[in-house]
Each structure stands twice: as C-alpha cells, then as structure tokens.
Amino acid sequence: GVRSGRLSEADLDRNVRRVLELIVKSPRFKGYEFSNKPDLKAHAAVTRQSAVEGMVLLENNGVLPLASEISRVAVFGTTSYDFIAGGTGSGNVNRAYTVSLLEGLRNAGYAIDAELEKTYTKYIKEETERLNPKSDDPMAMFMPKIRAGEFVPSARLLDKMVRANDVAIITLGRNSGEFLDRKVADFTLTEQESGMIEAVCAAFHK
C-alpha cells in the first residue's frame, strides 16, 4: 500500500476520485426513488426501435416489402414456429408478451398456411421431446433445451404449398447464451437447412 511505498498517494487519490465521479453520476446519488412499476410500454417502444435499427437487409432484389396482392403465405423453417424471443442464462429475461413471426404476419393481414403450420408444430413437439428426455439432474433446469433440427418438407407437400400460397418465407435461427462454446453448425448452414432452402426455392421459383 501507500505506507510500504508500493502505491503512491497520487495513484490512490486518482482512483478514489474516479470512484466518486461515478457515484455522483448515479441515480441513487441524484435522489432516485425506487419504483417496482417500470414503464413497460416505453420499454417496449425502445426495444422495437432497437430491433428495427439493428436489422440488416443483405439483399432484396425487389422482394420487400411484399406486393399488395400477396395475402397467403407458406412459412418454412423450425424457427418460424419455435420462436426465439431471448437467449439462455442471463439472456433469458421475463417479458410481458412476445410477438412471434406468425403473430406479426397475421397482425399485418397475411394468412398463414394452416396445414404447414400444423405439420411443423407436430414435428417440433415430437423432436423436442425426443431430444430432451426427462432428467433427475437438478442442474438440467438451468441448461438450454436442445432445439429440433430443421424439417425438410417432401416434394408432395411443397407442390401443395406452391398451389395454395402466394409466397414462401424461410426463417433460420440460432439461440445464444453463456457458458457454452459455439459449434461449427452455429456459424454455417446444416445439411438439413441447406436441403430445406434448396427444396423450397426450387419449388416456388418454377
């Protein structure tokens, strides 16, 4: 410390000053009164604004916004139906509500193909149960669930979707959190994802 000569008084004064400068800027120092009633509507508005500003459209080619005559949508991709609203660990927060992709499309006036939605919902439920068997490990509740792999629709189903809908939307997603290392598939497309994209594009671009 200072008495031993290993730390100068000037360094100590500088560090104390920095701590005090931070304290006087804090809400508590300025008389902030605690309230357990946050303005959730204002928070939601900021979140929406941040989401819009944080999105990056890599390529468009006149696809977006969707043409006014489009009303029926075939939605592909497990993430379209198993929506990722937050992360794992500290990224998993309490939220008043979540607007999923399907809800957002419906709110915008689009009709989601019911048969395709039923097919994906059934697949995701069965795969999630298979990949996440019940465990007696008390730490299991803190671990993120393994998400269902990508569903590759059959040629017959795709042909039906093309005839019943105006456009296809494909969603891919990755969850994120803490204390787990990334794997190759977190950065690249899996074989199932590539197969699904190729199959859907080939069917709808005929």
What is each model feature region?
Residues 27-36, 58-61, 206:
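A structural signal for beta-strand and strand-to-loop patches characteristic of beta-rich domains
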Residues 1-30:
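Long, well-ordered, tryptophan-enriched scaffold segments
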Residues 1-7, 41, 45-206:
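C-terminal non-catalytic regions of proteins with extracellular/luminal or membrane-system context
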